[in-house]
Every structure is written in structure tokens, then in C-alpha cells.
Amino acid sequence: MVGREDAMGNDEAPPGSKKMFWRSASWSASRTASQVPEGDEQSLNIPCAISSGPSRRCPAAPLTPRSHHNSKARACLPPLQPLAISRRSLDEWPKAGSDDVGEWPHPPTPSGNKTGERLKLDLSSTQQRVTDKSSGLAKREKIAFFDKECSKVADHIYVGGDAVAKDKSILKNNGITHILNCVGFICPEYFKSDFCYRSLWLQDSPSEDITSILYDVFDYFEDVREQSGRIFVHCCQGVSRSTSLVIAYLMWREGQSFDDAFQYVKSARGIADPNMGFACQLLQCQKRVHAFPLSPTSLLRMYKMSPHSPYDPLHLVPKLLNDPCPGSLDSRGAFIIQLPSAIYIWVGRQCETIMEKDAKAAVCQIARYEKVEAPIMVVREGDEPVYYWDAFASILPMIGGSVIKVQPGDRKVDAYNLDFEIFQKAIEGGFVPTLASSNNEHETHLPARENSWSSLKCKFASRFDKGFRYVSKTPLSRVYSDSMMIVHSSGSPSSTTSSSSTASPPFLSPDSVCSTNSGNSLKSFSQSSGRSSLRPSIPPSLTLPKFSSLSLLPSQTSPKESRGVNTFLQPSPNRKASPSLAERRGSLKGSLKLPGLADSNRGTPAFTLHPDDSNDIVFNLEGIRNGDLYPPSDCKGTSVDSDLPEKEIISLISCSKSDRHKSGGDTDSSGQPLACRWPSMEMITKLSRAYLDSESVIAIPLPSDAVGETGSRNLYIWIGKSFSLDNNCSLVDSNKAADTVENVDWVQIGESILCQMDLPKDTPIKIVRESEDQTELLALLSAL
């Protein structure tokens, strides 16, 4: 062994020389006395310190320093160095708040001797190391740089943090008029007397639900835009929450993907960085606002109307349920069931009126922003029709009949108790805001601002309702600019609206007007052909609290008709439409009104309204497969045709219970309809196919079906392919630029013909061109 070899090697050394020991001989903990053989101990003969004395046998070297304290050899050893434990610098570890900036530095695990060869684990294939040397500190410095920055994302949208929200001078310098506070539980409404506020209570957590409030935010952004205002959207630092809402808006408004919208916002505000949960929700939102085809797992979606946050219990939003089935319904609430064939609003027997109203508004938002083309039906607990349960069974085959046997009013889901309790206390006046506004620190009752989101929906609804009652005598235009809404002229007494809504017409997305025959969500204009297929999107949130019930009209459209025609309503002379987006950009001249379309782009005639007030709202499903926003209606009750076409758009119309008359028309003594030739209005008593002259325009009132069982009539305007306006220009409004037959608004002419023929003003008008499909008209003529 080493210690023994050293001792033996020193036997031949000259007397008086130092005895050298290896440190390992004294520090070897593995060597024990029992391991040394007895023969070895006898062979260890070490010379004595006195050179003249004989050799003597010495005991073996001590095992440890502690076992031999007085040895001279121990004194000869170099002093032992203390063990060095190096502590890592504090800067190399993550600091508090690193998760707030979105990046975690990844320091190596503390190790011993770095110069020696050690086993290393290569994680390059599984984890990408942060290569930016300034990742943590620079990120915080960057946030500090944007602390006082009011970042402009769009003409009317600015993004920032709390530091800007509390600085009135910065807000004023940027022309801010409205503020959306995303962190109501942290930041109060600092300058409520100077700006219009709305608040959300969003946690910067991946589990926070932002999908349910996106459409309310879209409404707010559009409301600000129509007022030519500017809105400042802020959270604490302007990094995650506020930027997520703006990204979602750009995805809908501009038709951008999530990546494009995110990069656009990030170019305006370099620290924009939605958390992972928000990003996932925005990717799901992208599929909806771009009208992507539904996946098999998304065929059935069910929403429960509930408060978005306990801080604002009257802000009701549709929250997506994880288990969509009849067992998820609760008699205390309102639910939205979205199927490929229809959208149902299920109202429980104990549901409050406020919740039912907001559910109807939420459905209109879904139809508008997601471009839903399905009928919308309201069913009440206990009165569910059979087709309602059949719709469930078609998606969930395992649903049995036992679901229907639940007693009406007894449906209850315990998981909803907290939401309903919060909401019930709020409507009973038991809710007091946790954070008083800056200019009133003594609020002891529920302030109006706590329900501001519902009031915004009512604002759109009231304006839309006024338009409907006004149009009962003069139909609205079916071809809209990107604003899609019609504004009353200043001279019309019935056009009085609030000051906040008269600045400009309501503003809808240009992407909400798209080609009906294309799966692409973006709009498609065709200037070369002089016509395009435009499908108006659903109107803004509609909430009409004065109406008490909703019913569904049966479809009166034949399969051919549902695939075929599409006419256009003429705007009232007392109304004007805002210029379209294409016109404002200068890329499209003239009106986007397209009276003459191919057969594939035509639809059934537009609806008309009864002038008197009504107590019912009817979701009419007739003739809107190709984008008719306002289909016709004779208001014949609430019976439902189970064979309704799947793709139809909602149309909200009013009709009186006491005025459900049948549309009539003039006939001769033999019962044959009286036709006339336009513009001379020459009556044609014996109508036949021979009278369909290529150089004439013939107005023909005919039954809506071949057998005439429905009793309703349509006014068909047959336009010959050789008809010319050369001698009839005076009969066409010169303001409409009707230089050709294609540019004539034949629906307006049809309304004039209705008056001259003493036909009901609500008679649907259909345009039939000789150069296009005439199958329906010829079939009706042959049946006479």
C-alpha cells in the first residue's frame, strides 16, 4: 500500500532525513486496522530518530488525523484547506415577477469542478435555450419604456397600461374619448367625468375566459367608431389582456389570421404578448369569425347565460358548456343551443326577463360575427316542439326519451347555483360595486354603469327597432355598404336618435358582407362583370324588451325558390346609406346596389312590416338561403315546417296578432290575375306566355305556390332582354345612376306598381329576367 511503500522506501535514506508520507495514507477512510494483516505489522521496521540506536518496530500509521494527535509526522503535513462551496450569484436566478414578463431564464444546475470531464445531458432537442442575453432584464426595461406609451393600433383604437390610464394629459393629447378598462378590480375609472368608461374584470391567467366577452367588445369598438371617437384599451401594462382583445377585433374586422393580427399589434406595441391561454382562445375565435367549417366535435355547442364576473353580475355573457346535452339545461336560466341546422334559445320557466333579453341579443351577436346561416328559434320550457328534441337526438344519438319527461320548472344543475345566486342578488339590489368611481366615493346602490354592456346592446336594438317600424311603409334596402345600417335623414321626425348614435351610421365589418356562393369569409367584389354577390351580415345585437314572445314562421319557399331568386329592396327616399368602404377608398365607384343578378344569386322577395305596434317578434326563415336579410312574411302563426332548409339567416321582424291578413291581388271575373305592362300600365286581361315580350316589362301578381293553397301572392316583374331605357329614363330616379337596365332598382319600381295596382304594400316582389332562369314563373303561368 502507499503508506507502507513510503515507509519501506525511507529505510535506506540517510539518518536525520525527513520522513515523507502521502496524504492518502492518513486520510484513507477505507483502510482499517482489521484490514492490515498481522505479518505486515511485524515487517514494518522504521529506524529510530537517534542514529546510534538500534532499529525498532513502530506501529502502523494512524488511520485518521483524529486518532493520532501527537505525531510529529502529522505536523509535517501541509495545512488542510477548507472545503469551498461556491454560491451562485443572485442575478443568475429568476427574479420575482419573471412570469409577468413572459420569459424565464434557464441557468445551469450548480456543479462542482467545471474543468474536469463530467457527464453532460444534451437538452437541445427538447428545450430551446434562451439565446437573448438581455431576456429578463431587457424585457422589464422594454415594459418600462412603454409605460407611458399610448400605442396607436388603428385609427380609433389605442392600447396602453395603467400609467397612461391615470394620465389625463396623455389621453387628451391622443384624442381619446372612450376607455375600456380590462382590470376593473385594480384600476378605477380615473376620469369618469371626462371620458366614457366601460370595465371588464379579467385576470391575466391562462384559464381566464375571454371568448365570451369578445362580441361585447366588438360592439363597443364599433360603437366608438361610428361616433368618430377614439378608444383607449388598457390593462396593467398593456402586454396581455388589452392586446388580446384588440387582436381578436382585428381578426374579425380585417379578416386576418391570429398570426397576422398579432404581428400587426406587436408592430404598434412591441411588448404585446398574450398569455398562452388567451392565444389558444384566439385561435379558436379565428375559426368562428372566419366562418370555418365546423369539426365533428363542434356540431353541437351550448351556451349558458351567466355573469362574466362576480364584480359585474349584470354583465351576462354566453359561456360555453363542456357537456352539451339536455341534462345541462336549468329552469332558472336561458341557454343557447347552436346546431348546424338551427340555433335554439331555450328559456326556462324561472328565467328572469333580463337574462332572456340578453340571450336574444347574444344570439344576434353570434349570427353576426360568426356569419351563421341557420334559422333561430325560441323555445320555452314545457313547450318544446318535437323537432327540438329530434335536433338533439341527431347529434347525440344516446339521448333517450327520459329527458323529455322531466317536469317543467324542476330542471336544476347544482353547478350553476353560484352564478344564479350572484345574478339574483344583483337584480334584487343587493349588489354594491367593490370599487367606487373616482368622482363618487359614496355609492350605496347599484350604479347604471354596472349594466353598461346591456345598455349598449339595447342601443343597437332600439335603433334597429325604429328602423323596422319606419320601414313598415317603405322597405329598407337589402344592399348595404360596409356599415349595413340605414340612417334617417335629418328632416325625418321619426329618425330622432340619441346624440351618441347620430354622428355616423352603425359600422359593421366589411368582412361581414361576403359572397354567398363562396366558402371564403372575405368579401368578393367583381367590377369587371358589373355585379357581385353580397350577403349582408346579421344586424348588431338586437334586444327588444317590450316584446314578449318569439315565434317561428313556416317556410313558404319551394326548393327551387330557395336556391334561386334574390331581389333587392329600395331604400326609402327619407333614408340614406353611408358610403361603402370601397367607395371611401376610391376603389369602387357608384353604388354597390346590384339589382340584376344571375339566377344563382337571386333570392325570395324582401319582407314588409305592418305599421301598427306588435307584441310578437317572429324569426322568419323564408327565402334567405342566399343572403336575404329581410325575407317576406304573412305572419301565419307559429307552426314549424320540419323540412326547413338548413342554411338560412335570421331576420327579426314584427307583426301584429290582429293583422294576419292574406296578401291579395286584383283578378278579373274569371279569377285570372290582372297583369300590366310597365311603364304605360296597360292592363293585360288574358295573360299567357305570348305576352312576355322581349322588349317589355310585365308586372304579374301570381300566387306564391302553384296550387294557390296559401292564399298569398307575389308580384313578378318580368324584364325582357331587349327592353331599353331610352324612352323611359324620366321614370327612373336620376340619382340612382340608372343609365342601363342593369342599374335600375326594379324593387322600387315594383313598389310603385303595387300602389298603382292597389295591391297590398307588403306583397313580395320578385324580379325575373328573360336572360335568366324563368322556371318558377313559367310553372305558375302554366298552372293558371
From Swiss-Prot:
Q: Which GO biological process entries does UniProt record here? A: defense response; response to L-glutamate; response to salt stress; response to UV-B; response to UV-C
Q: How is it modified after translation?
A: Phosphorylated on threonine and serine residues by MPK6.
Q: Where in the cell is it found?
A: Cytoplasm, Cytosol
Task: Name the residue ranges with Polar residues bias.
Answer: 554-577
**Active site per UniProt:** 235 (phosphocysteine intermediate)
Where do the record's region annotations for Disordered lie? 1-73, 94-118, 488-586
Q: Give the observed phenotype of the deletion mutant.
A: No visible phenotype under normal growth conditions in Wassilewskija (Ws) ecotype, but Columbia (Col) ecotype show growth defects, elevated levels of salicylic acid (SA) and constitutive defense responses.
Highest rank taxon of the organism: Eukaryota
Q: What is its main location?
A: cytoplasm
Residue(s) carrying Phosphoserine = 558, 572
Which amino acids does the record list as binding substrate? 235-241
> In what residue span(s) does the Tyrosine-protein phosphatase domain sit?
149-291
Q: What is its EC number?
A: 3.1.3.48
Kindly give the Gene3D superfamilies that the UniProt entry links to this protein. Protein tyrosine phosphatase superfamily, Severin
Low complexity bias located where? 22-34, 489-510, 521-553
| One cellular component term from this protein's GO annotations in UniProt | cytosol
Q: Which reaction(s) does the protein catalyse, per the Swiss-Prot or TrEMBL entry?
A: O-phospho-L-tyrosyl-[protein] + H2O = L-tyrosyl-[protein] + phosphate
Post-translational modification Phosphothreonine, affected residues: 64, 109
Additional detail:
The observed mkp1 phenotype in Col ecotype is largely due to the Col-specific TIR-NB-LRR receptor-like protein SNC1, which is absent in Ws ecotype.
Under the heading PANTHER family, the entry gives: MKPA PROTEIN, PROTEIN-TYROSINE-PHOSPHATASE MKP1
Assembly information from the UniProt record: Interacts with MPK6. May interact with MPK3 and MPK4.
Q: Can you say what this protein is called?
A: Protein-tyrosine-phosphatase MKP1
